[in-house]
Amino acid sequence: MAERANLVFHNKVIDGTAIKRLISRLIDHFGMAYTSHILDQVKTLGFQQATATSISLGIDDLLTIPSKGWLVQDAEQQSLILEKHHHYGNVHAVEKLRQSIEIWYATSEYLRQEMNPNFRMTDPFNPVHMMSFSGARGNASQVHQLVGMRGLMSDPQGQMIDLPIQSNLREGLSLTEYIISCYGARKGVVDTAVRTSDAGYLTRRLVEVVQHIVVRRTDCGTIRGISVSPRNKNRMMSERIFIQTLIGRVLADDIYIGSRCVAFRNQDLGIGLVNRFITFGTQSISIRTPFTCRSTSWICRLCYGRSPTHGDLVELGEAVGIIAGQSIGEPGTQLTLRTFHTGGVFTGGTAEHVRAPYNGKIKFNEDLVHPTRTRHGHPAFLCYIDLSVIIESDDIIHNVTIPPKSFLLVQNDQYVESEQVIAEIREGASTFHFKERVRKYIYSGSEGEMHWSTDVSHAPEFTYSNVHLLPKTSHLWILSGGSCGSSLIRFSIHKDQDQMNIPFLSAQIKSISSLSVNNDQVSQKFCSSDFYDKKKSGITDYSELNGIVGTSHYNFIYSTIFHENSDLLAKRRRNRFLIPFQSIQEQEKEFIRHSGISIEIPINGIFRRNSIFAFFDDPRYRRKSSGILKYGTLRADSIIQKEDMIEYRGGQKFKTKYEMKVDRFFFIPEEVHILPESSVIMVQNYSIIGVNTRITLNIRSQVGGLIRVERKKKRIELKIFSGDIHFPDKTDKISRHSGILIPPGRGKTNPKESKKLKNWIYVQRITPTKKKFFVLVRPVGTYEIANSINLATLFPQDLFREKDNIELRVFNYILYGNGKPTRGISDTSIQLVRTCLVLNWDQDTKNSSLEEVRAFFIEVSTKGLIRDFIRIGLVKSHISYIRKRNNPPDSGLISADHINPFYSISPKAFILQQSLRQNHGTVRMFLNSNKESPSLLILSSSNCFRIGLFNHVKYHNVINQSIKKNPLITIKNSSGPLGTAIQISNCYSFLPLLTYNKISAIKYLQLDKVKYSFQVINSYLIDENGRSFNLDRYSNGVLNPLKLNWYFLHQNYYHNYCEETSTIISLGQFFCENLCIAKKEPHLKSGQVLIVQKDSIVIRSAKPYLATPGAKVHGHYREILYEGDTLVTFIYEKSRSGDITQGLPKVEQVLEVRSIDSISLNLEKRIKGWNKCITRILGIPWGFLIGAELTIVQSRISLVNKIQKVYRSQGVQIHNRHIEIIVRQITSKVLVSEEGMSNVFLPGELIGLLRAERTGRALEEAICYRAILLGITRASLNTQSFISEASFQETARVLAKAALRGRIDWLKGLKENVVLGGMIPAGTGFNKGLVHCSRQHTNTLLEKRTKNLSLFEGDMKDILFYHREFFDSSISISKSSFSRI
């Protein structure tokens, strides 16, 4: 022993790691025997001190970390900010989830790192601290849950639970945290027992594969090796892993530093030599591994290396295979036990960041980066190659190199502070992660109408599907609105843009006169311009017919033809109509009947060919009761201009209307009641009741007849069929399917006596049960159709007309399809037939391109009497009337190409009055392609909010007073493409055309040119280009009525005028919450601008949802979504949870070579990089052999890395050589292919790779085969010993097959000798006769190498074995790689 003076004295705490180092140094200096004696003394000393100290563990020893409070508070603040960004639509759900995980995981990790210094400073002899860090019991993760926080939990599938547990076990858990903890932990005796059995079975399978691997030789003579380098192409290998990989190995080549050889071939590596390699910075070191051993059924000493037990080369006869199987399988039991202790705590990882070394300005080449979004939704730049970033300070310039595929988080010329994060390094593509593709479903949080921008693919993914794909990042919007009950949809007479009251249990048509604003106002004129140029803006015609009055998209004019047709004065001169119409004041004085002609004018005044100009509902064709329409023998033709039309991207959908060709149809009446699902029905199905019978508690029947009750989704439909019931004989033939109409004279009401019928009847077969049926004879109403409008009377011939281009045609339409039910609400009548006037004009050669006419409202003043007319004339160009809405290019907001398409078109409109509740709203109508009935969305004042744009308290009253001086200013410039104005704060908003007085109206309204006059606050000037100049320095906003845009002005006090500004608020624009439109102005909520007015804007509330490329949108544009409906599906790739319970299944998955659930998204890029190296070896001799070797070697390295990654993530240290022995066995077989039939092996036969090479060399014949990857189970059933195979699985099949083939078992392995009771052929003391003598002269083997081998020897070493991780993905080797000898 060394002298006492030379001993080193250490005065510090020795933990488990220090003990390991101490033992290692003792073994190196004193050997095994003396080291064991020293350690025995250390053990005795430890027990004595522990007894004297009398350490006990109590609850008071669990000390919470002081910094936990502010760390948790900071994490909550970050989560709150993240929640706000998600609410504003800046990040989507997946980005929010990822960032939330990292926030809480980082907080938990900080607490865990603070735990050890806290104990060390406050109480170094704390029992919990000494227990956890001595390695005796518990670890840092478990103690962290006691004194830190439990953090995020995993569910049984390994997915993260979004709610973190902030408490620790010392503080106690709340009820919610306890339930999450129980759900996440899901531990118990059964789970632990199952995991333990899995670990034991894994160990058994591993031992089955390698039980015959015994050290039989000293040197196999191989010249191959695997290169290990601390600096790989893709990433740096940590020094600790580098040392663990090299220690105990044997060099395959000499190591030179400069010209001096520092290590020789076949020299084993110790810690001293490895440290010297690290110090001198050796680039690559070639080592021998079990992969490179040339022995087939055993292994040599030099390829195995040092024995971990003795620290010397492994001895001959050592059963290293069983040691390897036990070394891998036994930690699986530890994983199971550790699972129970940790309890499902989620573990993850954080990205590596690059920070600025000091303050300075960032400089980099912007051409080498591309803008993108990080996985957290933050804006960043992506660099594809190494990017040099220069940080310029006052006195120094620092250069930072950002590796490829990293995110740059700062902009060019941005000033950064010291330690600020400037880049985020993405993990290299070669690093293996268990990734999986996950679907994240986003559900609608509210009820409303779905909108999206032009970024969404409007064509569905599949035919007849409602799934749309996103080509790039965009917003989805749920516009607020309440839907009416589904039971009332079919019977509703409301159309798009109708004003109504909610609920609408009883509906009656009301005059438009209720919408007048003030009785003392001038006659209201309806005129506006279309704000879109379809040809210029690139937007298809979504806003052709846009509403301007509070009733609909159309202007409804009730003409004066209600009593006599001659009251309508019609003049046709110069290819135009002049039709007078009434003003609202005139309508208020006299009662308007509902049976008059309703003239429909689009808002832009443009009629296309065959479009409906007016319609007339004849009261003779109205019914108050519900029923079914029949006209089976009629011929129905669809016309060009359909009545209910919805235009959207991708096509047009029409609700068909039928043109009558025969003047008779039939109506079969029935009484229908739609009841809620919870209603109490007091009658039975198929029963007969009389008139005024109580059906429910508050409903009585209007007619008598047969009761039919049908229960549907969330409602009950009760029908009463009036008529007679007959029970026919078997001889009567009654249609089984639908009813039949029987004309008069053919009736047979009684089989014994025949009787002629006077009227039509409807015979219907009703089957209450399978065997019984009866016939219901129902009365039928017959309708004859006659011409109700005489065009000659309406529009008399005009002697002064020049050409008769424009004409009106009369069409009669049946509003319901054949066999379709008609439904009425309460006392509302049902219109069966509608007479429509359709505009048409002749096409000549000069005007062949004219496809539209324009209608204008004009006013003619004669002797103080004002008459209003409609002028209809052919127009050649509508560019002068249609203005393109455009935002200035510097506005930074949505351009005209991104404006959403606006609402659909419905010609009919009614105003509904409800006396029950005064909740006013507007109907939005949608047609669902899958449903016959339309659905309604009611937009009420609760879904919108008004924001005043002038909120300066100092000048607010002045503005209000100036508005009150002129009552015309209160008439708001409204609406535009978005349709009806909403009643908010009892203020109606329409009438875009204003006149100053009755006498001067003709000056502003000319016949040939419509001159638009508008009213703005006097201090604003708007020129013809829309540029705004403000002479009042106290206001900062101005409305441009022609474009319906708000301009916010920045004042210039030096010149006393305002500069030209960009558009901030436009009609129809979507914007997210927290948008600050100007200084001292309110922050707007998210929504869509519905109305733009002089002093305020009305915004429809909307909820934005951000979606990234590849997401799938469920539902069509403008479809009604209910709360909880699936809105978007995100498909993203995430790393599988690092939960410790998943460790054992991952190892088993890799060893059994099972295919993973989904392939990594970047697998294609990896294969491309892999193929680049393959091209270097094509076209040279022995290329097939190299291809097979390449496949096998790279798959071996990949498998070793995967298994090591799993165990290292759990803190389990396993030497690579153990895993290499296992992987060598499952990759040592090749599959003989059918090409190039061989006389030796059968196609599909599994043979060893070395055997195939030697056989081909001996026969001088090329044997075609391909590499195959076997699992440990298949490898156990494909060995040289059938006794070993039969003792594992499938005993009968294996023995029968071996007997038929005449297989011979040479009993070389351990297991077959155990089965037969022989001596185990292993052990260092075994008979030396079985141990093969090693070859002392390797030069003999070198001389036997052929010249061909020398051709590619260097390439083999460089190409195949230089990179440690070449192809890191979970692959099944099925690629055909033929080897030719």
From Swiss-Prot:
Which SUPFAM superfamilies does the entry mention? beta and beta-prime subunits of DNA dependent RNA-polymerase
Q: Which domain of life is it from?
A: Eukaryota
User: Where do the coiled-coil regions begin and end?
Assistant: none
A GO CC term? chloroplast
Q: Report the record's disulfide bonds.
A: none
Cofactor(s) this protein requires: Zn(2+)
Gene3D superfamilies named among the record's database cross-references: 1.10.132.30, 1.10.150.390, 1.10.1790.20, RNA polymerase Rpb1, domain 3 (1.10.274.100)
Q: Give any single GO term for biological process.
A: DNA-templated transcription
Reaction equations catalysed: RNA(n) + a ribonucleoside 5'-triphosphate = RNA(n+1) + diphosphate
Q: Which residues cross the membrane?
A: none
How and how many cofactors are bound, per the record note?
Binds 1 Zn(2+) ion per subunit.
Q: Transcription: present as a keyword of the record? A: yes
Binding residues annotated for Zn(2+), in chain numbering: 220, 293, 300, 303
> What is the first-listed, main subcellular location in coarse terms?
plastid
Q: What is its EC number?
A: 2.7.7.6
HAMAP family hit by this protein: RNApol_bact_RpoC2
Q: How does it assemble?
A: In plastids the minimal PEP RNA polymerase catalytic core is composed of four subunits: alpha, beta, beta', and beta''. When a (nuclear-encoded) sigma factor is associated with the core the holoenzyme is formed, which can initiate transcription.
The entry sums up its family as follows: Belongs to the RNA polymerase beta' chain family. RpoC2 subfamily.
Alphabetized NCBIfam families for the sequence: rpoC2_cyan
Q: What does this protein do?
A: DNA-dependent RNA polymerase catalyzes the transcription of DNA into RNA using the four ribonucleoside triphosphates as substrates.
What is the protein name given in its UniProt record?
DNA-directed RNA polymerase subunit beta''
